Structure formats: C-alpha cells, structure tokens
C-alpha cells in the first residue's frame, strides 16, 4: 500500500519521537547481528552515570569475548555474549548507531560498545530526559528485571491466550495494546493500525471483545507487524514510527484505504488516536474528550 505524500508531515512531535516499536527494533537487531556477530568486545564505556542501570555483573566479564547475536524482547535490544547479555532500551530519543568515528565526546552519547577491531556501537539519546540505558545481566538471570515486567511478545500471543486475558481485564483496547505488561512490542502506531485492521473501536473495552475479538486482534497484530517489518528490512538504519507506512496512523484527513471514509483522530491522555469511523465505530465520530458516550 502506498501512503499519501502528506503522510510524513502529519505526525505530531510526540508521535515522531515515540519509542521504537517491534518492527524497528527487530529489523535493527537483524542488521546489527549481520554486522557485529563474532566481534570481540574490548570495552563498554558509559558517558553518563545513568547509562548503566546495573551494578553487577560488571561489563568487564564480557571483554575479549565475541558477540553471539543481537536479539530482541519487546522493545528492548539484547547484545548477547556467553556470560552476560547487555539489554538496551532506547526510550523515545535513543538510537544504537554504528560508530565509525568513535569521537571522545560524541553528541548525545550515552554509552559505547568498543570492539577489538572495526566500528563501535554508540547509544545516543536526543533530548534532555536521558532515560535510555543499558542493563548488564547474567544469562542465567535474563528473565529477571527489566524483562520480567513484560507480557508475552506480540508475535507470540495466541487467540486463546488473548481471549483469556481480555476476560480478566477491563481496559480500552488501544491502551491494552500499548501496555507492555499485557503485550510486549506494540506502541502508539501499531495500536492504531491493529485496531483498524481488526475493525474494532480504539476505545472498545477488552472485557467485551470475547474470543472473536481476540482472534481478530491477533490476526491484525501479525498483519500490521509483518507490513512494518517488510518496510524496516528495506532500510539500512532504524526509522521512527512516523516514517513507517500505515493505514491510519499519521494519515488524519486522508481517505481510508479500505472504505474511503475520512480518517479521523481523537485526543486521549496526551496522545492522538487515529481511526476510521466506517471501519471501526459504525460511522460514529468520536468526541474529542474522554467523557464522550462513544468512549465508554
């Protein structure tokens, strides 16, 4: 599907700086695995005192050992060595970049992985919040913090498990999809896209969706993630979700590619939800406040 040429100009600042989602992180893990597997770690250098989130084990235990692969769990990258794994969360403004220059004071530098030869990997973070960071975790404790807080990975969720979860929660589906405790890897864009593909109002309550709704959501997750991954794998670097093509996200005012109705948005809890009235809400336009009877 081709996006409107206006697509790139539509997202708000907050949307453009959203935390990278599963497609961006997975494709970047694949790129880094291809480029850095087998490279021996010489040094891990944090540039700020907040960059390294753990005290033990020390990063030095991986020095001289080859990188086995770069994996992913939810929105986290995992640099896997034999004794430890470096878990990296990019937050909103972070990137893990191939670092050819290895400047002593890199702009927005948070931490650097230096290898015995070739380029380094540089964790950067734009802005002032400085929330991106690295956890050095023993491999036998990899299921502990911070990954223990995550729900099942988005691509591993089954219709049966999701229906069971829906039955025990009473959340708006858009918020449920973005809650990393419920499903790991989705964010604002994918929540918009999944709701549209599943033909579900973004404010439908999970407790009312049932098995049929759960099956529709799982199918929509796979379709939206597969489309995002296909796009990300054409790139040589990590995009932001604002760059990635979608059906409704960032396309407010455009015609819906499914039915032709105008894509609309509603502000909710500080972010923008995009939806198609015909496909998702029975033609009803959601009021731009949380007290609307259509949001209940």
Set out the residue ranges of the language-model regions:
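N-terminal polybasic/positive-inside topogenic patches
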Residues: 10-11
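Phosphate/anion-contacting hairpin/loop surfaces
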Residues: 15, 82, 86-197
């Amino acid at each position: 599907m081709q996006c409107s040429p206006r697509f790139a100009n539509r997202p708000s600042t907050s949307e453009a700086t959203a935390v990278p989602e599963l497609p961006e992180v997975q494709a970047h893990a694949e790129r880094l695995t291809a480029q850095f597997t087998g490279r021996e770690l010489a040094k891990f250098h944090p540039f700020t005192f907040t960059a390294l989130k753990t005290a033990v084990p020390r990063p030095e235990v991986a020095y001289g050992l080859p990188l086995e692969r770069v994996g992913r769990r939810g929105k986290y990258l995992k640099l896997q060595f034999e004794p430890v794994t470096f878990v990296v969360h990019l937050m909103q403004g972070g990137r893990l970049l191939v670092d050819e220059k290895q400047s002593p004071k890199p702009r927005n530098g948070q931490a650097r992985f230096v290898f015995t030869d070739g380029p380094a990997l540089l964790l950067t973070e734009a802005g002032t919040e400085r929330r991106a960071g690295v956890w050095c975790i023993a491999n036998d404790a990899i299921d502990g913090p911070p990954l223990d807080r995550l729900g099942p990975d988005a691509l591993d969720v089954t219709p049966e498990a999701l229906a069971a979860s829906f039955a025990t929660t009473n959340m708006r589906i858009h918020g449920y999809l973005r809650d990393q405790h419920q499903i790991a890897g989705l964010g604002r864009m994918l929540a918009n896209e999944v709701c549209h593909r599943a033909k579900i109002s973004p404010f439908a309550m999970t407790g009312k969706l049932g098995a049929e709704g759960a099956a529709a959501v799982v199918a929509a997750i796979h379709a939206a993630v597969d489309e995002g991954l296909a796009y990300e794998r054409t790139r040589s670097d990590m995009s932001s979700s604002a760059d990635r093509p979608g059906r409704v996200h960032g396309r407010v005012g455009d015609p819906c590619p499914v039915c032709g109705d105008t894509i609309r948005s509603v502000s909710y809890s500080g972010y923008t939800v995009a939806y198609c009235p015909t496909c998702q809400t029975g033609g009803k336009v959601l009021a731009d406040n949380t007290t609307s009877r259509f949001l209940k």
